[in-house]
């Protein structure tokens, strides 16, 4: 009997330069998980967002105060989220860091030898579900 890999919800995978803290300036691949136990809804800001009017999470407006990524935790946005296995998520992360000078999407850049980081964020990634997804992604990246 073949083991079926569990799928996890995520809102986005992208590559950018770390902009905060000790690792400011380090190229980083990001995976933003979906759902959060905190539900910090806008700190008094009105939420006019109706998810039915959007087809992609990228089209949602960014709030100007409070949690600027409510789409990553509010259940009403679940239909806009991706849902994949850790193996597929690992492939998407590698694809996000591929460039002309790093065509294989390596975390150690083949030319500059600069390390790239992987950051798990959004939706309380260290809760049990996020931990399982993160470990599955690490295992898939090791292959």
Label for each model-derived stretch:
Residues 31:
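Residue-level signal for inorganic ion chemistry
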Residues 17-23, 39-40:
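Short N-terminal binding/cap micro-motifs at the start of the first secondary-structure element
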């Amino acid at each position: 009997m073949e083991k079926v890999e569990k799928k996890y919800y995520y809102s986005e995978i992208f590559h950018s330069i770390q902009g905060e803290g000790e690792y400011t300036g380090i190229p980083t691949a990001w995976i933003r998980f979906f759902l959060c136990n905190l539900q910090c809804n806008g700190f008094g800001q009105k939420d006019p967002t109706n998810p039915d009017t959007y087809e992609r999470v990228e089209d949602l407006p960014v709030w100007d105060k409070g949690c600027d990524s409510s789409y990553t935790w509010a259940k009403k946005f679940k239909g806009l989220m991706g849902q994949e296995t850790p193996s597929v998520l690992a492939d998407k992360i590698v694809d996000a860091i591929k460039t002309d000078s790093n065509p294989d999407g390596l975390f150690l850049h083949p030319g500059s030898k600069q390390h790239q980081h992987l950051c798990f964020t959004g939706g309380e990634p260290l809760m049990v579900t996020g931990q399982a997804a993160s470990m599955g992604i690490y295992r898939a990246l090791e292959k």
